[in-house]
Amino acid sequence: MDFSTRAVADVGHLMRFRARRARNPATHRWVMAAMLGGTLLVAVAPAFVPGAGGGDQALSVLTLMPVAFAGFLAVAVVSAVVSGGGRELLPRDQAAPYPISPTTDHLGALLLAPVNTAWLLQAWLLLGSTAYGVGATWDLVTAQVVVLLWLLVATSIAQVVAWTMEAIRRSRHGIVLMRCLSATLLATAVWLHAQHQLIPVLDRVPTVWLVVGGIDGFSWRWALTVAVEVAIALCAVLVGVFPAHLAARRSARDELRVESETREARPNPRSDLFALVRTDRSSVWRTVPMRRGLLVLAIGPGLVAIAGDLPWHAMTILPGLVASGGALLFGVNAWCLDGRGGLWRESLPVAPQTVFTARTIVLAEFLLITEAIRRNSASTTARAVNTA
């Protein structure tokens, strides 16, 4: 269970293996360069917007930064927990015959965290907000260093939580325990909101200390903030190895139960399109992380809106939010990250437009079902709140 150099070397081998699977390496390099350039632009350009670095709006942005830091941590935790410990460098079934250690999986999940679109958008939001709040001064450099380190800290902590939750979920009564824990956390949040204590709790989050140290300019206070973030990140990376090994020694009960179910054979589809739709539909609804993600997307925004006293006229943003989240959750995976499915689909004698049409149909079904669940849950919660 040691943090060995072999695990680090294995991560390098697997990353190079993934990079060489790209059909067009030149395009892959251009995409990476565009992502880095976009990140740099987001981190600098808002500082030159009129009103940046001074005025009421910039001050309001800086005031909300501690909550934004905590929100990024929450998003990172939810994404990692829902995905069952993070994205794999190599799929579990393909990695079975190879001596890939859980430490390698842990480090690989950390490196692949930016592949998550929710992670990337939240990171850009933090960088852009910091640039607007601080303005075009040299303090922007020190502030962005603190923000970048916080991205590393939050991602490392999220992986520790995700591997721990996965180890608990794979225990004998882990699924029931996880559901009880989720219900307890939800009930606690509702109680805090009912007692008007949610905002005071958010105002006391420890990220306030980090934000103050980041905007203080180059000083001993800033150096201490950077040192604390580096120490927390290193400790989280090392600590995450232990729950990763614990989870690896236990069977994924919910995934294995779904994969081992016996299903009656259905009649052959009438066309290639129907066959592909059936295959894609099964791949979505028989994947446990996709089910978890659907519930989070369908129920989460409505509960957050109710807890935050979002006006009813502003509820119209929720369908678009849920639809875009569902498109990112399933659509990006279906078209860009579906490595295992992409390997064998390319060998089928099917026209590319048929594959595209099938995935579009299944994506539309996924979004419609998610939005229907969201609408029902939001209306039910609203009636309960109004009755209370």
Task: Kindly label every feature range from the protein language model.
Residues 1-92, 101-340, 352-388:
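Hydrophobic alpha-helical transmembrane segments of membrane proteins
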Residues 345-347:
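Catalytic phosphate/nucleotide-handling subdomain of diverse soluble enzymes
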